[in-house]
Regions:
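Active-site activation/catalytic loop segments of kinase-like enzymes and analogous catalytic loops
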Residues: 221-257, 272-289
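All-alpha amphipathic helical-bundle segments outside canonical DNA-binding/catalytic cores
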Residues: 260-270
Length: 316
């Protein structure tokens, strides 16, 4: 989450007047994340998340995201739904942006997960994949494998300001990964960004899965590979924890069957995931406005992960 668009108290109060969820008490911008502007809103009735959708999120995609959340919630998954106003409309306009008032879920994001927490998070993803087998809508992945080469070219040699020689190293890695990229694995609706900060927990129990704005239709096992890259390493990407990695896979498989073919593809899927996040982080590092309330994330943390997956089979 992040804040790019500022909203005045007066505008927010008028926005809330469209709903039956109390009057504004306070609103605080949330700096984490990079995609949209988010506020924690407290009213006389409850707490909510206000999301304003920035340029990277197409308003044409919002029905897919919201329908996916409704489908998951209806099937017992702990996800936040967008709340309709008195007229039954969920997608609003505020401060020149499309916006939604979203359910607030209890729990905290875990910075240093235990194996038990990783198992629970993996199981939560497996349960979502089970539920999404009945979700028919399709959204092409705007950051899928076919976009990575053009994305690197858009970044250009400016990435060398992040680390000397990074462009050439990324190009070599990308050529290798795309040559091996699987094209015949099962495809489904996926979250595609299930980092620890997008999972809320109380103890070892998952209480919320949030931030579905990268959700799309892509290789189902890629979702698990993304999760592995983000959960099983420290924040700098320097240290891999095999107990966490194994617990994620075990938890996932407890709720959704992972085929031998999918399991065998996890190493290449993880290397691809590392390059995807290297590239998007590099772009954000180079292009985030100086006055944006957003925490930039180190692209090189994902290059280190890529190197770890390249050198060893971390799924063995």
């Amino acid at each position: 989450m992040a804040v790019y668009t500022q909203v005045s108290a007066e505008a927010l109060g008028a926005f809330l007047a469209r709903f039956d969820h109390g009057e504004l008490l306070s609103a605080k911008g949330i700096a984490e994340g990079v995609q949209n502007s988010n506020y924690l809103v407290e009213t006389t009735a409850d707490r909510f998340i206000l999301t304003l959708y920035e340029e990277r999120t197409s308003t044409d995609d919002l029905p897919f995201f919201l329908d996916m959340l409704d489908h998951l919630a209806a099937n017992g998954n702990p996800v936040p739904r967008a709340l309709p106003d008195r007229r039954g409309v969920a997608i609003q306009q505020l401060a020149g942006r499309s916006a939604c008032l979203i359910e607030f879920l209890t729990g905290v994001s875990i910075s240093h997960p235990t194996a038990a927490q990783a198992y629970a998070a993996g199981a939560a993803m497996g349960q979502m994949h089970t539920s999404l087998a009945g979700f028919a809508q399709v959204r092409e992945n705007p950051l899928g494998a076919d976009t990575w080469q053009p994305f690197l070219e858009r970044c250009g040699r400016d990435v060398d300001s992040i680390a000397p020689g990074l462009f050439d190293r990324a190009q070599t890695a990308l050529t290798s990964v795309l040559a091996e990229w699987p094209r015949d694995l099962p495809v489904a609706a996926i979250h595609s960004d299930l980092f620890p900060d997008n999972v809320l927990m109380l103890g070892d129990r998952v209480t919320g899965v949030i931030d579905f704005y990268f959700a799309c239709t892509d290789i189902r096992a890629y979702d698990l590979a993304v999760m592995h890259t983000s959960w099983a390493f420290d924040g700098n990407g320097e240290n891999y924890d095999p107990a966490i990695g194994a617990a994620l896979i075990e938890g996932y498989a407890s709720r959704f069957p992972l085929s031998d073919v999918e399991r065998a593809a996890l190493p290449i899927l993880a290397r691809g995931a590392c390059l995807r996040f290297l590239l998007t982080r590099a772009w954000d590092w180079l292009n985030t406005p100086a006055d944006a309330l957003v925490t930039r994330k180190d692209p090189m943390a994902y290059w280190r992960r890529f190197e770890a997956y390249r050198k060893d089979d971390l799924f063995a």
